[in-house]
Amino acid sequence: MPLLFFALAGCDGSPLCGGLSQRNQFVRLACSVTNFQSSAMFEGSESANTQEVKSESTLGSSLSACKKVLCSNSVLDSSEYWLKNDKTLCRIGFLEDQHDSGCPTICFVNLDRHTSDWHDDNYIKKLASVCPELPRLIESLGVRQPKENEILLLSSLEPPDSCQHDPSHPQSPRTADVCLVHCSCGRRPTQTSSIIFEINKFLIGLQSGQERQKHGRLAGQRAAEDDTNRSVSSIEEDFLTASEQLGEDSEEDPFRNDPENSLMPESVKVLRAAHAQKRSEIEREDSEDSETLCTSSNSQKLSRTYSAPARGRPTTPKQVKESAGHYATNLAESVLQDAFIRLSQDEPSFVAEAAVSVSSDISHSTEAPQRARACSFELPKIVIVQSPDNSEEVTEWPEVQSHATSEHDSGNKAKAKHGTHPPHNSPVGHPAKPLEIALACAASVIGTITTPQVTEQLTLESGEEYECEDEEEESETDQGEYSFSSAVCGMSQVAGAVAAVDLADDSGDNEDLADMYSASMGLLSVAQASTAIPLHCSIAEGTSVEAFRANVAEVLLREASAVFTHRQSYSSVANFLETTHNKIVDGITNPRRPYQEQQDVDNFTQEISDSIFQYALEKAEKRKELEGPGKDAPNIEGFLSDCVNNLLFDVLCVTSRKISDISNCNMESCDGQEGSVGYRAYEADSKAGREALSQLQHLIEPSQAYNHGERRSSVEKLSALIGKREREQKHIQEERENEARLKEPYRLALNRVTATMVKEQSDLQGQLGRSDKNADSALPSAESSPLHMQRGRAGGESETRQQSLSSSSGALVALKMDSGESKTPVTCFAEDLATTVVSMATELAAICLENSSGKQPWFCALNGGSEGPEGLLLPCRTAAALRRKETQNGTSVTKKHRPPRLSEIKRKTEEQPELMERLVNRVVDETVNLDEPTTTDPFALFASEVTARIMNCPELSVVDTSKSGQSSRSRLQCERWSSRGKASSYESIPEEDADPSGTSNTLGPGNRLGHNLSRGSSISKQSSCESITDEFSRFMVNQMETEGRGFDLLLDYYAGKNASSILAAAVQQAASKKNGHLNVRTSSCLSKQSSTESITEEFYRFMLKDMDKENKDYSMTKTKEWSNSLLPPSPRTPFCIRQSSVPDRRSSDSRLTVNSPIKANSFDGFAQNVHGDSLNIYPTNSVSSSGLCKSDSCLYKRGQTDQITDMLIHETWSSSIESLMRKNKIIAEPSEDSLELDSADSQPHVQQFANRLAADIVESGKSQLGGQQDVTAAACQPHIPVGERRHGFKHSRCNNSGNRPGVEHQENSCSSYSSSCVRQAWRGQREVPLIHIEPDQREEASEEKGGVETHHREASHQTQQQSGKGSETATKSSSDSDRVSSVATVPPAGVEVERRSLSASSEESGSGSWAQIATEDDPQEETTSSFIQLSEGNGNSSTSSLGLADLEGFPDFSISSNLISEERERKTSHCQDQADVTLVVLSEVTSGLSTAGSSCQRELLVLNCDLEPDCVDGELRAALQWISASELGVPALYFRKTHQHNLTKLHRVLQLAGQKAWRVGDLFSAVAQFCQLHQDLELKGRPLPSLFDWILKTKR
């Protein structure tokens, strides 16, 4: 929780402040801000006065504030320093009000006013425009107008909502990160010192903004600490006696002038000396702060007095006891003052749960030691108390007068003060005694600054009598090491001494002895309680546990499981407690699992719960009977709870032991730990387990000497072991039944425990079943044998970690399958459908090709069902690797079934045309229907399954809808989608029934893509053109090797994102010809086994032959009849994946209703090779999209996937396939083809067929969501006949130069789906585009003769503009074509270098390829933009490339035409000006701030808010802020345009400074001269020019 700073009263030299007017005073506001309460304690320093303010924000959050008092003894205060400062002036930029810069925002609020009326509505409104809480906060604190040398730093501001739309106070979309409240030195400072003073204020504000940026979100909690001048709060002050601090207020304090003052408790001195070393380090850390803020004279004095190191055992003086008593008295006074002030406040009084009270003596004691300990606890920040305005005089402080009267009269003072100011609200029901409140306050001090390690010591001390205090302190000094814990213990003893003094000296008083004694004992007990559980400041200690029962229970259960399985290696008990504490707090602050008494659970969980409860109830009744009916016997509820807990503990123990055994099987020794719980009970069992597991480990490791029998026996042993334990588990469960009052945490626990075991056993059964069936089958893979392990994430869903027995890795490879990381259902669904296009091509090759070379990669006979549900899960990579190993070892690999030759299949299909149709349409023949399993209509089934998939349906099981006469077959059960689609190895697909008599069955799209097996090995090693295709080739080889193991057709295998490469190659090949024939080179393919090239070659041969056949008249009739038999059946809906994958021989106007989203993997290439032959499809019956989920990743855009499909084919070909084909001589080199490419007349039938085939294939790849366009979208996109589309297809395929003839083909259709994201990378035309986006290249842009064509993300739907040199088109998306085509802005030169589309690392290294997709301009929908990853460098670069890129959306900007014309005027001078000062205009184009990589991390946006604008000189302030930012090294400083009324003049000043290469010193000198002139002119009564006018006039 970010901590905020605010200031209370000023330090004006009153006696209260001891005359230290130059001293910094820090006021911190520790806020407990949760959804349950919003209260704030404001406390100050120097005297123990507090003020409490209730921060009543409706948003439930709070400010934090720090007050600083500037002084003039630092190097930054000398004018010489500034005049000689030769640092470079930073850049200045301007932002539109609607633009969210993404960089830290600092708001400077100037409180200068002509009137002191704080209740003026205008003032309140202006303050609220910065933060809604600011006016109330200032008013409730009663803050007077700060002095010139006082500033307030605010952070954690809430965004303004009320004034956001007020045109007179335009605000940024998000609130400022830091706000600095100050009063300026009048309208214009006259002295150089005043100018420097203002600069220092801006320095502090800008530096705070930088700090908040540097530490990220965590800095919110540390910002207060960083902003504080640690050299002031030196550590020696931590243990000052109360008299030394309070004594400054009263010279008549007898103890202060006592010569025994030096004889303080030795332990305190020694502790102080021990901390002296830390002080120097902290001062060194804080040297930057101390340049701006002075150090305290008091702390310097203390440094001289007490920094002598006192090592060894010091001698304890005889006066220790007496001085300890004095010390205790003074401490008691300060604590009682604190209590008294609390009681006398008008605001609601101290609430024990919400507020953290700290007295001034100990106020500094926490910061530095906490930092030194580097404890991971985030303790509440300590608050320093400062006096309010109404107690400026000494006489108003009764405790000072009392102090002069009696040293030890704490009780009397307490009563006197209590009588003078009766409490308004008491924390307890009855009026609390002041001493009790004081002790409670002291206890909260101790609880605040301690850690759990101290609890034990405090517990020991609480048992001792307070008379032993001196001995205890002496024993403290014996330790030799004076840690923070010992200091706290000393403080607790001192607090105990308070009670001792009161008890001894006030015994004759009205105060009751018993009360005193119990209060002193209560102090230590409260201290113990508060140290035992120090909560984060964001959680109130009084928060009810009720709402978080499930979260806390879940955390504790996970920790117990982790302890059992030895997964967490805790270094010590303290480490364990600390970690658990953090997790519990995290579970409370971020509750993910709402607590519900009646939570829906599955039947299995309910049965186990009932069984356990029944069993426990029986046991409890027996124990109740044994106890007897005596009145002292506990009720049955206690017995029942005890039994249930014991039972659950045993279950958890047994299960955890199993998990632990499995996870330990890779370790060197599998010895059980003697100390672990339940070890002896399961010792024999573990021994057997270790035996089987060691053999299992042996079988996993890549060994040269094991055969199938050994593998089989090892797996059987493991199965027997797990089965034995399963039986034990079931035996316990079978004895129980009904559940009535078992709470949810137990249900959750048991659910997880037992589900794991059942899963294990079923998986092993599946493995053994397959081992029986196939002698040469591979080891169980990740999908078929997951050994699920629990892994806790506090308060979240459990992650399943799958341990896959993978032979390639030789170890148990952990695969995380986290539902949070897995893709959204829409993404998965789209990725499934995206691969339909390639399956069409492979079907054709499979069905219609002669297999001349004798290879049989495609088909095998039907293999019948398999016993286990996972029987068909045989991932290609693992299986192929094992099979290759066996072959190397001489093991014979025998195929059970000889696959039929392709010629046989072709003959069958010719004999039975219905078989052909069935094969072509097989995707929709069997699907999942979760609602109506009895439905037999495959189309309805498929539609409902797709709908369920999109609507985020959980785990899908594939229902077998085959006819009753058929042999049963198993289907895949795919639990989750693989996280990110990174791997290209997937599950194989079940077999196809080749028997024509039966209904064909296939797999629904819910199960096509499986888990990724080898995250690292399956990812492209480099983002080169070849790697994508190489990977696909490897996968195809592995897959086809697997085909002989009980699978039917390859055509059900879907290869994911890279699958369309074969089709793209085919389309490209079809579009190019040489002498009327396709170029197929067969000589180099003879030696290749089944690979991508040979498959494609066969496909080409088929197409050649088919085209020749089609060209002859005699075959036309037959072909037409055949294709007409494949027309879509009437009940088919747009959810159909495809109706035909044969090259279209139908009439040219017949349209497919295929809707398949293509997931783009090279969007940047699309924008480069723009063409206008996008094809639209309008299905006859479209489905309403209102109920469907939207994809967050913006990968699919409604109505635009047609062109994405089209462009994907272009780009996949040019980026990856083409070079590989040329390398392998499958297609001719471009040099041989180049002349023929343009002659489209020699063989019209070839050209015709190629165009038609390509157009239909693209048309068939339409997005499913493409049919659900808005009515307006459909209206503005004219329908183009298929023939025209095919014509356009021809042009774009035949021209590789980039200036395609087809570009203008569809220019007239302006889409309402155009994107606001502007293409920013200038590119030269390349034949094969790079995959990653390049940085801007100004040279290329300026050398273009006719202008560069601007490529938008969806450029084929947008009007192209060519507007002079290097222009970029900035469009606000709309369906208004006039707006789109009317404006083009010419950015100055400085923008182009800065404005990169993506992070620098992905551009320069090329190891990660990224594309960026902008969302459509649709106000009703989420318009967020994101980056997708195309290919990774080494399998782990997913975050490295993305790191600095801003993933926020690119906002839409309206066009500011007057600014454009201004900028055009100055374009020439800016382009030539390469000096240090560059003006950046970020109004219409996407700003470099949001995407500029590392440089944006330090840029700052400055807002200025003036209560009365007349009171401040805006130009002078802008110049001083410019100087401050340059001094800090900020690369760029941004202002809001509306806040700078003198925008034009500032532009000219920036130009001037750039031309003259001004440095900071030059600008400062000019400002100083101007202020001096201003003073002279004012005295003479002459008119005063403005700063910018004067600079432009005199400095040219």
From Swiss-Prot:
<feature type="compositionally biased region" description="Polar residues">
    <location>
        <begin position="959"/>
        <end position="971"/>
    </location>
</feature>
<feature type="region of interest" description="Disordered">
    <location>
        <begin position="1328"/>
        <end position="1443"/>
    </location>
</feature>
<comment type="similarity">
    <text>Belongs to the AKAP110 family.</text>
</comment>
<feature type="region of interest" description="Disordered">
    <location>
        <begin position="214"/>
        <end position="233"/>
    </location>
</feature>
<feature type="region of interest" description="Disordered">
    <location>
        <begin position="389"/>
        <end position="432"/>
    </location>
</feature>
<dbReference type="GO" id="GO:0051018">
    <property type="term" value="F:protein kinase A binding"/>
</dbReference>
<feature type="region of interest" description="Disordered">
    <location>
        <begin position="760"/>
        <end position="809"/>
    </location>
</feature>
<feature type="compositionally biased region" description="Low complexity">
    <location>
        <begin position="1398"/>
        <end position="1409"/>
    </location>
</feature>
<feature type="compositionally biased region" description="Low complexity">
    <location>
        <begin position="1430"/>
        <end position="1443"/>
    </location>
</feature>
<feature type="compositionally biased region" description="Basic and acidic residues">
    <location>
        <begin position="1333"/>
        <end position="1356"/>
    </location>
</feature>
<dbReference type="InterPro" id="IPR008382">
    <property type="entry name" value="SPHK1-interactor_AKAP_110"/>
</dbReference>
<feature type="region of interest" description="Disordered">
    <location>
        <begin position="1282"/>
        <end position="1310"/>
    </location>
</feature>
<protein>
    <recommendedName>
        <fullName>A-kinase anchor protein SPHKAP</fullName>
    </recommendedName>
</protein>
<feature type="compositionally biased region" description="Polar residues">
    <location>
        <begin position="1357"/>
        <end position="1372"/>
    </location>
</feature>
<feature type="region of interest" description="Disordered">
    <location>
        <begin position="462"/>
        <end position="481"/>
    </location>
</feature>
<keyword id="KW-0963">Cytoplasm</keyword>
<dbReference type="GO" id="GO:0005739">
    <property type="term" value="C:mitochondrion"/>
</dbReference>
<dbReference type="GO" id="GO:0005737">
    <property type="term" value="C:cytoplasm"/>
</dbReference>
<feature type="compositionally biased region" description="Polar residues">
    <location>
        <begin position="292"/>
        <end position="306"/>
    </location>
</feature>
<comment type="function">
    <text>Anchoring protein that mediates the subcellular compartmentation of cAMP-dependent protein kinase (PKA type II).</text>
</comment>
<feature type="region of interest" description="Disordered">
    <location>
        <begin position="242"/>
        <end position="319"/>
    </location>
</feature>
<feature type="compositionally biased region" description="Acidic residues">
    <location>
        <begin position="462"/>
        <end position="479"/>
    </location>
</feature>
<feature type="region of interest" description="PKA-RII subunit binding domain">
    <location>
        <begin position="829"/>
        <end position="846"/>
    </location>
</feature>
<feature type="region of interest" description="Disordered">
    <location>
        <begin position="958"/>
        <end position="1022"/>
    </location>
</feature>
